[in-house]
Amino acid sequence: MVRTTLGVVIGTAASFILFTSQAPKIKAAEDVCQGSGKVANLDFTVKDINGKDVALNAFKGNVILLDFWATWCPPCKKEIPGFIQLYNTYKSRGLVVLGVSVDDSTSDVKKFMTQFKMNYPVLIGHDRDDLLRAFAPMPGYPTTFVIARDGRICSQHTGFLPLEQFEKKIKALL
């Protein structure tokens, strides 16, 4: 009787440990969008790297990773390869990655894009104080926003953040 009871207790404990120690589940979108839940102002038309007008509100209904960056910014250079990877992996599920360069020189941005093999849209934001104010405060670069399909800003981060942390948020929103 003692052995049977002990076996049941050990088996139950082992099962509990096994099932609760598995990889954490992806959080629901509501858990990811903690904070103010401010709706992103996407009512802007911005020029892309080739001078073409891009209406940000055309991306409503998608999960948007909006990254304000510069070619001279070391943490930006470190993050961009991860954004390329995220874009390649999740664009078919509704992820849009938009880079907003704050550089003065479009030719420098084009060289940078070629060097880093950037394949997502890059917009020119250096002369767009209205756009920068809409997403303020931005204490530095990179400043990256993750925006849910319903337009809520789910996170804002300034500085380098590992790919895995962005991916966790994005997967929960897709």
Task: Give the predicted meaning of each segment.
Residues 77-116, 127-133:
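Structural microenvironment flanking redox-active thiols in thiol-disulfide oxidoreductases
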Residues 112-119, 125-171:
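Thiol/disulfide oxidoreductase modules built on the thioredoxin-like
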Residues 9-17:
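Bacterial N-terminal signal peptides
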Residues 25-56:
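N-terminal "domain-start" segment that seeds a small globular fold
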Residues 1-9:
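Bacterial N-terminal signal peptides that target proteins for export
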Residues 63-64, 142:
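Alpha/beta-hydrolase fold active-site loops
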Residues 60, 68-85:
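Conserved redox-active cysteine motifs that mediate thiol-disulfide chemistry
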Residues 66, 98, 121:
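Rossmann-like NAD(H)/NADP(H) cofactor-binding core
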